[in-house]
Amino acid sequence: MYSFDLDGMHIDSTARTPYNVYNTLSAYTALKTMGAGYAGFKDMIEAFDYGNNRESIFTIDGARVQLHLAKNPIGFQQKISLVLKDEKPKDIIIQINDTAQDGRDISWLWDVDFQYLADSNASRIITAGTRRYDMGLRLKYEDIPCETTTDLKSVVADCAKNGTKNLYVIVNYSGLYRTNHMLAELEKGGADK
């Protein structure tokens, strides 16, 4: 959650990432530029429910599990910045797919500054998805060790039970809905289910 001051207003936003704060600032700027009224803006922003959007937070077996969408280089940079701000030990899972809705071309991965993950205090980095090996290769070029998996649910459950209790799951577009659903199931039943 982010708190910030904007044009004399103190806002306690429910935004979980800087990305959402940027959207808030853009909306405010647009209203101000158009000369539209913004009475109630603060209350609307503070009450806004981001729902199943670009990020969700779960608790699985006492572990904080954050799900984040990253579908292009700029979005991924934002997620890496978010991970770096969290100085606690963590586990990171990166799921990259290449379905039609994701786009078949994953060359954009080479435009992301993954080298910063070396400073993320990650105990484990695991790649998943149809392009898990490509993601692993991308990390290898940055001298970042990683594992790969075809069983995302088992790896999440293992990290939740036996890991740092601080897990980031970063997915591209096609992985968002299924992963969100899977994490919600694990949250209800625990990692043993």
Question: Where do the model's predicted regions map?
Answer:
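Glycine/aspartate-rich loop-and-adjacent alpha/beta segment that forms the canonical ThDP
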Residues: 169-193
